[in-house]
């Protein structure tokens, strides 16, 4: 093994000349001159958005916004077991959007975008963070840390904070025996199921269904707190251990945490790809996420065997499968589906 440069002089022969010693000394790189590690937030495939207000004026050697973004990115990379360089090679970016900050805590959205090609999907989380000494502690939506940090903070309005923290806590709420979730259009109306169960994040679980036709309007499948993740992608966190995603929306209503009821207008079917992925033909990409399901762990939930809008879904090949309702019949991709509610 070759000793480090700073220790090489002690291994030179005793009769070394002064000139040689000076040469050896000159080749050693002083610690202070070494290139510092680049912050994650400075990477070419990272974008940091949102507010500065409410963050500390200074935070050690790095700006508070950069330091917070670094901690959020580190959690995202850890949860997805990946690296920024790997995401960059996949043409994926990371966005950190800081929405609110107060009293040493912060709340926002973290997104990993997808290339705009078929079969690639983005993924996103709400996050909560708090100052812990000289470090930001971060919790991503669906983790115990998220719920604990949010519940103990003064972020958001009191009712919103308490409801979202409890609803997204994997330990505090048991999922209901049925999903208690409808379909992404008005109860008592119909749309065409253009795509059967398929993935939202590059493969299984098959958590998503595509709808089009009808009056074209996307509406909340159950009440809850609605968050615009980007301009065309909404997530509604419900009170029963589930949340629902609505993607590709146009004529979009921006919702920064509004308490919405079942059937609340979210936008219209479209081809928006605000976080990447692809869309062929205007539609609503509708997906189910779970917090208390041990198989979901705050992630997308397989629809196979679950009932939404009065229909029980059965998966097959991606975008295939079907849905059935006893006494009514079976709907395959391309068929009309009536929303019976829940």
Give short role names for the model-derived ranges.
Residues 1-34:
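Secretory targeting and sorting signals
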Residues 52-95:
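Short, non-transmembrane alpha-helical segments in secretory-pathway proteins
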Residues 93-131:
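Exposed beta-strand-loop-beta-strand "reactive/processing" segments of non-cytosolic proteins
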Residues 124-168:
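Short beta-strand edge/turn micro-motifs at domain boundaries
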Residues 149-233, 317-342:
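Surface-exposed, glycine-biased beta-strand/turn segments
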Residues 203-210, 258-342:
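Conserved, short, structured surface segments that act as functional micro-motifs
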Residues 217-228, 254-270:
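Short, well-structured beta-strand-loop connectors
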Residues 220-253, 274-283:
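Zn2+-dependent peptidoglycan hydrolase active-site motif and core
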């Amino acid at each position: 093994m070759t000793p480090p440069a700073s220790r090489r002089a002690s291994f030179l022969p005793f009769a070394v000349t002064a000139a040689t010693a000076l040469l050896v000394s000159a080749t050693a790189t002083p610690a202070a001159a070494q290139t510092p590690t680049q912050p994650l937030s400075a990477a070419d495939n990272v974008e940091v958005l949102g507010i500065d207000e409410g963050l500390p004026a200074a935070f050690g050697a790095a700006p508070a916004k950069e330091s917070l973004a670094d901690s959020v990115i580190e959690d995202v990379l850890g949860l997805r077991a990946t690296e920024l360089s790997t995401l960059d090679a996949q043409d994926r970016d990371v966005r950190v959007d800081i929405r609110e900050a107060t009293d040493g805590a912060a709340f926002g959205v973290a997104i990993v975008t997808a290339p705009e090609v078929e079969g690639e999907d983005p993924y996103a989380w709400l996050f909560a963070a708090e100052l812990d000494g000289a470090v930001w502690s971060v919790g991503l939506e669906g983790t115990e840390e998220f719920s604990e940090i949010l519940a103990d903070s003064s972020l958001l309005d009191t009712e919103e904070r308490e409801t979202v923290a409890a609803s997204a806590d994997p330990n505090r709420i048991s999922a209901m025996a049925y999903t208690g979730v409808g379909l992404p259009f008005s109860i008592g109306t119909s749309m065409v199921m253009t795509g059967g169960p398929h993935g939202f994040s590059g493969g299984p679980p098959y958590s998503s269904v595509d709808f089009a036709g009808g009056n074209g309007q996307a509406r909340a499948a159950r009440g809850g707190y609605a968050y615009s993740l980007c301009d065309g992608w909404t997530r509604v966190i419900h009170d029963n251990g589930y949340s629902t995603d609505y993607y590709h929306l146009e004529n979009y209503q921006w919702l920064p945490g509004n308490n919405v009821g079942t059937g609340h207008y979210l936008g219209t079917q479209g081809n928006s790809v605000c976080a990447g992925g692809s869309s062929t033909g205007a539609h609503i990409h509708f997906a189910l996420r779970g917090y208390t399901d041990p198989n979901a762990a705050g992630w997308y939930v397989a629809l196979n065997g679950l009932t939404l809008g009065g229909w029980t879904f059965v998966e097959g090949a991606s975008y295939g499968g079907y849905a059935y309702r006893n006494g009514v019949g079976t709907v395959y991709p391309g068929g009309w589906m009536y929303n019976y509610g829940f």
